[in-house]
Design a protein with these regions (language model features):
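Active-site-adjacent structural elements in enzyme catalytic cores
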Residues: 1-252
């Protein structure tokens, strides 16, 4: 909480409650920036996004910086703008190989545990507003804070993944149609694979769907597929976050 106050100002009580309930975890809080959060950190905005990841390697790295007198790490996402997000160290290397310098390091902590990006919550107003859906759902936010979590579309705050077209592979993504020979297919495991269709993923749970989605989309490009058919999951919560990513990936 001390680091929160270092980067952010006018922190509402419900933001502190969310931090206590869901950090470390896949949640980013957007807060009014403090004077120490300079433009090169905030992208020139009057807000700053704060997150405490749950991965033990990430936490260990942050603790090393704090032990040396720091207050955290300022860093962008490890992917090119608009492209499919990497969920493994190999995917990061594939994505950024031409930009990496000899002194650059990639920390390999295995595949991402959730798969889709963190929930982003705007905490600059009287109630929380969800700017990007993720594993921390609006219902979970409401149960934590006692406040109704609104969903913003669009927002005056620029956030990653808010454009209509995003998370897009080179292949064309088509939603909820019948796959034909030569297409790639991402669908729940109970859906059979038609003859000649390349099965990219067959998740059995919504959590597995989120974990394998981006890897499957990247695999389509690696195999040179032109079309990927994806059957969207139904339901609320994490399923809604997956549908959000799929609808953006199919909008190019």
């Amino acid at each position: 909480m001390d680091a929160m106050a270092h980067w952010a100002a006018d922190i509402p009580e419900y933001a502190i409650t969310l931090a206590r309930d869901f950090w470390p975890g896949p949640m980013t809080l957007v807060l009014k920036r403090a004077d120490l959060a300079k433009d090169f950190i905030t992208g020139g905005q009057e807000t700053v996004g704060l997150r405490v990841p749950a991965h033990p390697i990430s936490l260990a790295l942050i603790k090393e910086f704090v032990a040396a007198g720091g207050y955290g790490i300022a860093a962008p996402s490890a992917n090119r703008f608009g492209a499919v997000s990497p969920t493994t160290a190999q995917a990061v290397e594939d994505e950024l190989a031409s930009y990496l310098q000899e002194e650059d390091l990639i920390l390999d902590g295995g595949a991402c545990l959730v798969g889709v990006e963190s929930t982003i919550i705007d905490c600059t107003g009287p109630t929380p507003m969800v700017l990007r859906l993720g594993a921390i759902t609006p219902l979970m936010i409401e149960e934590s804070t006692g406040l109704v979590a609104l969903e913003s579309n669009p927002s005056s705050i620029r956030v990653s993944g808010s454009l209509d077209s995003h998370y897009s592979p080179k292949a064309k993504v088509i939603l909820d149609v019948v796959a034909v020979a030569g297409d790639g297919l991402i669908a729940p495991d109970q859906i059979p694979t038609p003859n000649g269709v390349i099965r990219l993923a067959a998740p059995s749970t919504i959590e597995e769907y989120a974990r394998v989605l981006y890897h499957a989309l990247r695999s389509a490009d690696q195999q040179g597929l032109e079309v990927v058919v994806v059957l969207q999951p139904g339901g609320d919560g994490l399923a809604a976050a997956i549908r959000d990513r799929l609808q953006r990936s199919s909008s190019k």
